[in-house]
């Protein structure tokens, strides 16, 4: 089969570079991609970049060396990076998953993050809180900017206190650290809180679990 693949230039393998294998959202995407690929006679190779640019560049070259027929990626590379443009110019199709890439260059399969965060935030405004917090990560990423924009759009005309915190990574530990720091600074729970990912929310719950009971409102 491998020799036949070399002759036909098709290996019936696909690559998927995701930011974090422990992130439940990406784990589910990987599972669905693998199931879909297998049903169509393809093998899906999965690797985690740990949301680090150098690791991601190494992985995309690895998948190119494996002669994958296409590459799916949730990229952390800046828009100015030419790695994927160069890869696609050499004949490897690149499809962006969850994190949008240049629409004139790449196909992207993404959610409407701005609208989703706007709707989520709006749902917390009745009854009107005095204070609302956004906990996110990686503010330089398009996906983070879209979610933060949706948060701010929902708060147009809001006169209460708005706090925005961004960490260095989409991780449970980062969510916990951000929430712990917030609680130490405020000395109380915020009236309303939005997180930009499930994994950050897990960390927030960890921090709330350890928050002293005497500090919690009855």
For every predicted segment, state its role:
Residues 9-122, 126, 182-188:
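Alpha-helical recognition/docking segments in bacterial nutrient-uptake
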Residues 95, 156, 198, 208-218:
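Venus flytrap/periplasmic-binding-protein-like
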Residues 18-28, 46-55, 77, 99, ...:
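Hinge/beta->alpha junction and helix N-cap segments in small-molecule ligand-binding domains
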Residues 83-86, 145, 205-210:
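Short Gly/Thr/Asp-enriched flexible loops that form oxyanion-binding sites at enzyme active sites
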Residues 13, 129-132, 192:
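Residues that mark the start of a beta-strand
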Residues 130-131, 160-162, 214-218:
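Short acidic capping loops at alpha-helix termini that bridge into adjacent secondary structure
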């Amino acid at each position: 089969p491998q020799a036949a693949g070399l002759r036909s230039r098709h290996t019936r393998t696909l690559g998927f570079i995701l930011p974090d294998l422990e992130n439940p959202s990406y784990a589910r995407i990987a599972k669905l991609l693998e199931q879909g690929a297998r049903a169509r006679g393809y093998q899906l190779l999965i690797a985690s970049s740990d949301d680090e640019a150098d690791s991601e560049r190494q992985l995309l070259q690895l998948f190119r060396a494996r002669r994958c027929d296409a590459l799916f990626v949730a990229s952390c590379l800046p828009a100015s990076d030419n790695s994927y443009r160069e890869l696609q110019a050499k004949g490897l199709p690149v499809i962006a998953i969850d994190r949008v890439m240049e629409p004139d260059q790449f196909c992207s399969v993404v959610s409407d993050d701005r609208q989703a965060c706007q709707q989520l935030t709006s749902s917390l405004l009745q009854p009107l809180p005095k204070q609302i917090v956004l906990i996110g990560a990686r503010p330089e990423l398009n996906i983070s900017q879209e979610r933060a924009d949706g948060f701010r759009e929902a708060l147009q005309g809001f006169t209460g206190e708005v706090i925005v915190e961004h960490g260095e990574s989409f991780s449970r530990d980062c969510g916990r650290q951000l929430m712990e720091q917030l609680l130490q600074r405020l000395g109380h729970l915020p009236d309303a809180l939005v997180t930009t990912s499930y994994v950050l929310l897990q960390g927030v719950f960890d921090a709330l679990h350890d928050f002293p009971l005497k500090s919690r409102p009855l």
